[in-house]
Amino acid sequence: MIDIDIPFDNAIMMYNYLWAKKFNIKYIFNGYSTSTEGLMPPNFSHYKFDKRNVLDIHSRFGEVPLNKMKILGSLDYLIYDKFYQIRLVFPLDYLDYVKDDAKAVIKQEFDWQDYGGKHYESVFTRFYQGYILPNKFKVDKRKSHLSMLICSKQLSREAALEILNNENPYPSKELEREDKEFFIKKMGLSEQEFESYIDSPAISHRFYKSDLDMYDFLSPVYRYLKRVFNIKVFE
């Protein structure tokens, strides 16, 4: 399955909502930016709030009990958003956000160091995006990231193609080797088991149970209610 970042991304949002509810906080600030992250082909990732998918996969293959681990699903999101009225706010969408300008500011003010790629501050995500996605799924997420910079006029198409054609997704071969060893060790795999995983056929998230099954079933009804009665549950 392509989106092995789901458990981490889901947990971040779930516990943001839990703490917001506990302390009666009505707004959660999110660092998402439409101008740099607004485009993502559907086959590059999977629905992040797919609680049913996570639970089904864990029930089949999980070896560590989830215990009190909370997972955010579609219904949970609606409850937090509509009933508790806890809103996600995206401050960067209210600004003339220019990625290179923002990087220059945090370098100067906070001595920030460029990690060499989007989300590459995380070893797991760096290895996932820089190695697993290109080698197992033939997906280069830089295409999506660079496309948004082109759309927001922060980068030319020619410059983007130059990056894609001449720069490796990994900052260096040495770092790639270190991250690979780290990942294999943390996952409790042998190198042979890892290579077998990379070479095995990709399986869709939809092979397992999914919240999207409910969407598929209810979407015709929702479109009718929205058109005839102007009922907007998801807006």
Predicted features along the sequence, with ranges:
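Nucleotide-activated chemistry modules centered on ATP-dependent adenylation/adenylyltransferase
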Residues: M1-E235
